[in-house]
Curated annotation (Swiss-Prot):
Keywords: Apoptosis, Cytoplasm, Isopeptide bond, Nucleus, Repressor, Transcription, Transcription regulation, Tumor suppressor, Ubl conjugation. This is Breast cancer metastasis-suppressor 1 homolog. GO terms for molecular function: histone deacetylase binding. It comes from Bos taurus (Bovine). Interacts with SNX6, HDAC1 and RELA. Interacts with ARID4A. Identified in mSin3A corepressor complexes together with SIN3A, SIN3B, RBBP4, RBBP7, SAP30, SUDS3, ARID4A, HDAC1 and HDAC2.
């Protein structure tokens, strides 16, 4: 068989393949060039970034130092202002002109007035209670005195009546004994009786003062002794009558 010549389409396809290979080669070369330029630019930019960072760091440090200095100055200024304000307030308080002092002081003065009024009212009530208690005690003391006076009067009256009664009994016993002696004298036949004697010849009873110890006794003791003696004499007289009889 005779050899056929290549067709036109086949040639075109080969030509396109060659052109594509050439284009790919060119593209690879351009990419290599771009990558090289990028690495160079990155190195340059890294060097610039380090310098810029160092410069910015130094600027930040200087700014920070300036800020710290300003802050310390402001703090010192604020401290001086606060100190001066406190001194002024202290002077106002010492002069009793500060509102922090005058307002509580006014409240304390008002409460003081109220407490003084309450204390005055309480004092009045206490004085009334004491006055009433004093009047009650005084009235009770007067009533007690009157009752004691009446009791003492009744006691003394009873004692005096008892003494009077004893004296009456003693007088009656003396009268009885004197009559007995008169009867005895008449029974013996005495010619001279007590009544027949003239008054100038009658023997008077001697006035003899008792021993000193008698006057040292109380009156009630003397009366009791005297009554006991008279009763003893009255008891002895009937025994003498019996002995004198037949």
């Amino acid at each position: 068989m005779p050899v056929q010549p290549p067709s036109k389409d086949t040639e075109e396809m080969e030509a396109e393949g060659d052109s594509a290979a050439e284009m790919n080669g060119e593209e690879e070369e351009s990419e290599e060039e771009r990558s090289g330029s990028q690495t160079e630019s990155e190195e340059e930019s890294s060097e610039m970034d380090e310098e810029d960072c160092e410069r910015r760091r130094s600027e930040c440090v200087s700014e920070m130092m300036d800020l710290e200095k300003q802050f310390s100055e402001l703090k010192e200024k604020l401290f001086r202002e606060r100190l001066s304000q406190l001194r002024v307030r202290l002077e106002e308080v010492g002069a009793e002109r500060a509102p922090e002092y005058t307002e509580p002081l006014g409240g304390l003065q008002r409460s003081l007035k109220i407490r003084i009024q309450v204390a005055g009212i309480y004092k009045g009530f206490c004085l009334d209670v004491i006055r009433n208690k004093y009047e009650c005690e005084l009235q009770g003391a007067k009533q007690h005195l009157e009752s004691e006076k009446l009791l003492l009067y009744d006691t003394l009256q009873g004692e005096l009546q008892e003494r009077i009664q004893r004296l009456e009994e003693d007088r009656q016993s003396l009268d009885i004994s004197s009559e007995w002696w008169d009867d005895k004298l008449h029974a013996r036949g005495s010619s001279r009786t007590w009544d027949s004697l003239p008054p100038n010849k009658r023997k008077k009873a001697p006035l003899v003062s008792g021993p000193y110890i008698v006057y040292m006794l109380q009156e009630i003791d003397i009366l009791e002794d005297w009554t006991a003696i008279k009763k003893a004499r009255a008891a002895v007289s009937p025994q003498k009558r019996k002995s004198d009889g037949p």
